[in-house]
UniProtKB/Swiss-Prot annotation:
InterPro entries: Rbsml_bL25/Gln-tRNA_synth_N, Ribosomal_bL25/Gln-tRNA_synth, Ribosomal_bL25_b-dom, Ribosomal_bL25_C, Ribosomal_bL25_long, Ribosomal_L25_dom, Ribosomal_uL5_bac-type. Coiled coil: none annotated. Residues 1-20, 190-209 are annotated as: Disordered. It comes from Bartonella tribocorum (strain CIP 105476 / IBS 506). Part of the 50S ribosomal subunit; part of the 5S rRNA/L5/L18/L25 subcomplex. Contacts the 5S rRNA. Binds to the 5S rRNA independently of L5 and L18. GO terms for cellular component: cytosolic large ribosomal subunit. This is one of the proteins that binds to the 5S RNA in the ribosome where it forms part of the central protuberance. Residues 8-20 have a biased composition (Basic and acidic residues). Belongs to the bacterial ribosomal protein bL25 family. CTC subfamily. The lineage of its organism: Bacteria, Pseudomonadati, Pseudomonadota, Alphaproteobacteria, Hyphomicrobiales. Residues 192-209 have a biased composition (Acidic residues). Keywords: Ribonucleoprotein, Ribosomal protein, RNA-binding, rRNA-binding. This is Large ribosomal subunit protein bL25. SUPFAM superfamilies: Ribosomal protein L25-like. It holds the Pfam family Ribosomal_TL5_C.
Length: 209
């Protein structure tokens, strides 16, 4: 789980595009806190801190504590809006949570040992079907990433969710099928049948020797 952090915030009395533009000119970002059966709370948070948190990665899987006046609110960033041209944050949605909350999160997938994967060493290509997996997880134990070891995969292999060891109490949202996360695809000059023939040839030479 990523290390939590604290954000200082202020209540936002005015809403609307004009007010939001003025806030951004003053180094602030409009945001809202919702959830836990409480009314939505309009706030502002520092632009610079949000910018760096978003672009550092793991923003939507890391718990934050928002300090508002004398109140401390535990939240999980659920969504954010970026400027389509300049890529700076425009707005953030925070989900209010508690220590016992179970939340839905998109957890990034990290692939390990690409340099030793048999299929990749023979020229195969890692075709990533899902860069993230939507899961439910305890709010206080959200993993930074789901790690998949490629060291045993060959050309033509598919990696399904059933082959992945998920952390305790982390469950994929999709339950009705064994969905694919990635495949090791053959390069244009080599198909799977060629790879199989090569393996059989190697095995035959080994037995002969």
């Amino acid at each position: 789980m990523s290390k939590s952090y604290t954000l200082k915030a202020e209540k936002r009395e005015r809403v609307g595009k004009g007010s939001s533009r003025e806030l951004r000119r003053n180094g602030l970002i409009p945001a809202v806190i919702y959830g836990e059966k409480q009314p939505p709370l309009a706030i502002t948070v520092p632009y610079k801190e949000i910018f760096y948190k978003i672009h550092a990665g793991g923003f939507r899987t890391t718990i934050a504590t928002i300090v508002l006046d004398k109140q401390k609110i535990m939240v999980l960033p659920k969504d954010y809006q970026l400027d389509p041209v300049r890529d700076f944050p425009l707005h953030v949605d925070f989900l209010r949570i508690s220590a016992k909350s179970v939340v839905e999160v998109n957890i990034p997938v990290h692939f390990l040992n690409e340099d030793t994967a048999p299929g990749l060493k023979k020229g195969g290509v890692l075709n990533i079907v899902r860069h993230e997996i939507e899961c439910t997880a305890p709010a206080n134990a959200i993993p930074e990433a789901i790690e998949i070891d490629l060291s045993s995969y060959s050309i033509g292999d598919s990696i399904h969710i059933s082959a992945v060891q998920l952390p305790k109490d982390v469950t994929p949202i999709i339950q009705d099928r064994d969905f694919t996360i990635a495949t090791i695809a053959a390069p244009a000059s080599l198909d799977v049948s060629d790879e199989t023939s090569e393996q059989e040839k190697d095995e035959g030479e080994t037995q002969t020797s």
